[in-house]
């Protein structure tokens, strides 16, 4: 019954959520959105295609090649940054460095400052043009530091409000010195649980995959709302980004991990959790949900 009551509260909280999201800066309609499928839920990033084109192209190259699949967050500095993009993991082979392509030219600009909720490229100390695979999320306003060293760190995207809730959950995890074989690369690593013997996948904050979401203008209104709800309530809509389908007039997505459905029909949004009730439950107006999703960047 906890799941049922919680889902029912989603609709009642819609207007409060929309009011909070209204304070966020508008996202350009043409911005590319990338979803990192983490073990704690999706982290959605609106890329600054026009402002940092070389850096965005570099990042998308790794996303599209699958380089970030089975990677993990390898550094957490609470109140500062969390960092990923550097290593993949398999229980058979351990941590493996993500293969790096050519370094990208630094595109730092003071108009894209290292403030909370942004993603920026990591790089080698003393070399402004050395960014390759690794990136970090700013947990705080770090402009006074990161804007003023090593040529400035290039911000190339902004995390959506639901995505930052996931980032904050990662930042709240225990941090350990995971593996001295990697020098200082894994000496501030967040862990889901401590290993009892050998390190295994379930110990890491894994990123199962990274993928572009379809362009907003190519999505249905329902799909935009589904993407938003998946990010806002990952505990109920998992795994995120399943295919949409139709049945009996409903346009819906099925979430296998939670055995739940989200659907729309005749301008209304619905959910169904068969294990709790055979009845389809209303969540409110699709138009209102779309307004909240749009303000959040979806």
Where do the language-model regions lie?
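Bacterial N-terminal signal peptides that target proteins for export
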Residues: 2-16
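Bacterial N-terminal signal peptides
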Residues: 13-25
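Cyclophilin-like peptidyl-prolyl cis-trans isomerases
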Residues: 29-298
């Amino acid at each position: 019954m906890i799941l049922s009551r919680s889902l029912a509260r989603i609709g009642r909280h819609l207007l409060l959520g929309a009011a909070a999201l209204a304070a966020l800066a508008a996202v350009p309609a043409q911005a590319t959105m990338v979803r990192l499928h983490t073990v704690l839920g999706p982290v959605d990033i609106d890329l600054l295609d026009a402002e940092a084109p070389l850096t965005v192209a570099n990042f998308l190259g790794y996303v599209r090649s699958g380089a970030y699949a089975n990677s993990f967050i390898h550094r957490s500095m609470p109140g500062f940054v969390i960092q990923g993009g550097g290593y993949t993991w398999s229980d058979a082979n351990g941590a493996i460095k993500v293969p790096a392509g050519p370094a990208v030219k630094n595109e730092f600009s003071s108009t894209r400052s290292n403030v909370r909720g942004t993603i920026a490229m990591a790089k080698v100390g003393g070399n402004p043009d050395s960014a390759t695979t690794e990136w970090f999320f700013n947990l705080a306003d770090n402009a006074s530091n990161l804007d003023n060293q090593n040529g400035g760190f290039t911000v190339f995207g902004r995390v959506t409000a639901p995505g930052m809730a996931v980032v904050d959950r990662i930042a709240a995890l225990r941090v350990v010195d995971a593996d001295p074989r990697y020098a200082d690369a894994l000496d501030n690593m967040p862990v889901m649980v401590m290993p009892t013997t050998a390190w295994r996948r379930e110990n890491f904050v894994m990123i199962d995959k990274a993928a572009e979401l379809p362009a907003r203008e190519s999505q249905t209104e329902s799909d935009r709302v589904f993407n938003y709800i998946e990010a806002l309530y990952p505990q109920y809509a998992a795994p995120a980004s399943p295919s949409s389908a139709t049945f009996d007039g409903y346009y819906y997505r099925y979430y296998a991990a939670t055995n739940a459905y989200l659907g729309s029909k005749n301008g209304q949004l619905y959910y169904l959790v068969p294990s709790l009730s055979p009845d389809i439950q209303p969540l409110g107006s699709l138009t209102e949900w779309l307004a909240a999703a749009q303000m959040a960047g979806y």
